[in-house]
Amino acid sequence: MKFLFALAAGIAGALCCGENLLPNSSFELGTAGWGVMNEVPKENGKFQALRVRSSKDSVHGASSLELRNPDGGLVVLCSPAVPVAPGEMYTFSVWLKASVPMTAELSFFSPIDGRWHVVSRKVPVSKEWKRCEFVRKIPAGHPEVVVRVQFRSEGTLFADAAQLERGGSASAYSPSAPVEAAVEMPKTWCTAGERNVTFRAVNYGTSAAEIPFSVTARNALTGWKTEKRLAVELGGGKTVEQQIRLPLLNRGAVELGAKWDSGQAIPFRLAVLNALPRGKSDPEREFCVGVNETGVFRNAGTAHNPYQALGIDFAGHLEMLHATGVSVIRLFEYELGRSWVINPERGKFEFEQLNRFLDAVAKSEIVPYICMDTEAFSINPDSKNPRHVAVRNWFMARDGKREKPLNGMKNAIPVSPLMADWNAYIRAFVENARGRVRYYEIMNEPNLRMTAAKYSSYLETAYRTAKQADPQCRIVGICSTEDYGAEADAFTANAAKIGAFAFLDAFSFHPYQAALDSSAVPADRLLDKLNALRTKYRPEVQLWNSELFYIHSVEDAKKHRRTDPQFLRPENLTRRYVIDFGEGVRVSTPLHVWQLFEKHSARMFADPTRFGQKAVPNASAAAQNAFVYFLHGAKPLGRLELPAGVNGYLFRTADGRETAVVWAVENSRGFFLSLPAELKVFDLFGNPLENVSKLLLDERPVYLTGKNLKGFLTASAFQPQEVIAVTGARFRQTGELAVEFQNRTANAVPLVARLKDGGEIRKCTVPADGRASVRFHTENPAPELLWFDGSRQKKRRLNPVSVRKTMFSGEKVRVGEALEFSAEMTPEFLSVAFSVKDRRRGERIPGQPWTGDCLELFLDTAPESGLDRHLPGASVYRLFVVPVSANGLPAELSGSPNLDCGKIRWSLKENGADYSGKIEIPWEAIGCSGPRELGFDIIADDAEGTKRLAYHAWAGDDRNHASRFQFGRIFMESRRE
């Protein structure tokens, strides 16, 4: 039925108007630019993707899409993300017919600010072609949309002539351009080499034309590009297809495209990878990297989440992950199958659907490990979501105990299952999975939900029971997190102290506050601490980094932590892997799987199952692939001794050669590295860097191979790109600005500096590999700085940290009606007296004083140093003074790990819910030889019952733990009259 094709001549003018926003809307180019997702229930067991076909039964042109759905599962056809004007009306129309009468659903889908917004309309579909329409006003804040067609009926749906246009009604259909083209490959990844590329083009007009096309492949991150030209004879109303050979020799994230005088082809994105060894890795013998979840068995509102196929069978999906370097996958119960369905009644277990999933994973080259507990240890008491109700009812039928809410857990209450139920669940699960699963992690982030002692009891039961069920299994435990501001160090140390290490084969951690070597707590420093625990309590226990979704540099954290928290640059992933491997970690699975794949919307990180688009490995996946390519089977030889600002590790590969990985800690402070001819250098993705004698080293690691690398990589091989760098500026008080300079050489450097808007000339000497702060008088909130380091004059516009509150030694201060305090500096102590008014005493969680009524002190002994670091570091101390809680916990004084609380004198007097007291902190307890000017803040936390109601802060707010730049300042001298 081709009656619309006959209208082509009549709408020739409309073809050039661009009214239709959808590319390949007539589907003459197959599914190019579009995505198809189909769900396959676990009981199916085959986990195969829908084979989309082109049908000659069409409305427009020669083809339509044919979507066969023999099992009646969900099938979704998705457009690419299309820019739209918020506040305007848009009409989505598409011609549909079906092999049997059914109902389809048209929808507008927008991923905005971390949420999915979907508005749908159901339409009847018959055996005859019918145009279906959906009109929607685009809400404010939705600059792009995806339109979708979906159905859940057995049978075949045909789709053709889709159109998205501005306005409140559908106009006559017209393609988005007179000529359209696309380039595609069979997979979204390949190894480097010459590869076949499919080129398709369609001419919607009536006249034949010979069109010169330029087909390209480019890697935006490396600057590589290749091009092939071809002339194509396009008959009127015809589609042509050609196979061409392209040399895809540059590894990384590559985009295939084509252009001609009047247009551009629909691009095809893929990853070009290094070829990796086949077969499974052994986490007990070699370093392994991996991800959290397979990503394609997501929550679909059912107890047994189905396979959500993205144009690829599950076996192919796992093959793709392995090609990117994934050798282990951390699996959760919500991906495997809901615990209340696996264990619906005491003594009853149903593993049939789970086994189909485990069988499929076991056939792959990837080793699974399962995190046990997700829904057994927390419930949502108020949610009406059917899944939450099912969890709640399932748990309460087991007579377990509800606990008090813990910090970081939103809308959830931690619970304690009966140990007999926990024991039965572990035994049945491990016995069933024996031979297919060897590794089990006991609980995800238990420090958010229970004390170390309680956790250790569940860990011991799981360990003993699992070993009886499968003597070959391995137990991973602890799994403490620093996310949500949680304290991981104390939990891990307490668990180790009470004997938890006797009941695990590896202990895992989530280092959210120590993600990189540029973090406030450098990654290697945290690993030193964890390795010390391991050495003290059980040296043979392995270290596993099982989750770290936010691997941010300092600049990344400022830009993306709130708006796009899972933002990831490929160099940061490589750095994390190298640090983990070099410091003795055995397994590193920091990422969620979709962090290794291209985003299909510019607005947020969203997994491709929501868009139905193919999963395309991104630059981070290519960087991971290169890491595994160079260091598979290698042994770490240790951290290299390099100049400040440069980091790196040395490894011996399986064939006995040396490989070093080096990088600059921060992009703004690069180094030149002189390279001898006999040294081979490779970029982040494994591409050789040829004919480079002097390399500018930045945050992107490079791989070096050759002999005597440790001898070559000495301080003399590195020259700073910038001798003196300005790290930052901060107002000390109104009219007085501190600017910090960093010397990146091995020699002291004399410096002359002034502000451009006038004022004094300042002179100082910046010590070798050190920093110095200089103060200027200015009222300008963003002055321009000029400085001379002996070689040349430089300038920079400053963006200082603004003034916070200030006080003098001995001054009394009131914060609202709730808090009054004074702080005095004596030769021996910093003395703080305080009085807090409280209406009602609240409860608190053991080990988490900030969850109840308490007084917090924040001290920064170097407020004008490290001005490129807002996160609290070694100079920042946090102290808690806590009265008796409503749930019976005693008064106590505690503090951050770097604070020796045993040296601090304190007193506390309680009068009903009010409390007052005095704290005397010896200067040596905070690393000072005597009185000095401090960054300072004080907060009175107010809780009632189990809720933290408010905080009363002098200078900052409840984010002080994440930014020292919120602190005020306390001056040494008394207030001048």
Language-model segments: which ranges?
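Extracellular beta-strand elements of beta-rich domains used
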Residues: 27, 94, 134, 160-164, ...
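Catalytic-core region of carbohydrate-active enzymes that cleave or remodel glycosidic bonds
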Residues: 514-595
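An acidic-aromatic substrate-binding cleft motif
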Residues: 269-327
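Carbohydrate-binding surface patches
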Residues: 198-202, 207-211, 641-678, 684, ...
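Structural preference for beta-rich elements and adjacent junctions enriched in aromatics
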Residues: 60-61, 171, 777-977
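Aromatic- and carboxylate-lined catalytic core of secreted/periplasmic carbohydrate-active enzymes
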Residues: 574-671, 684-688, 698-719
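Substrate-binding cleft and catalytic face of glycoside hydrolase catalytic domains
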Residues: 324-504, 510-514
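Extracellular and organelle-lumenal recognition/adhesion modules and their flexible linkers in secreted
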Residues: 13-243, 247-248, 253, 257, ...
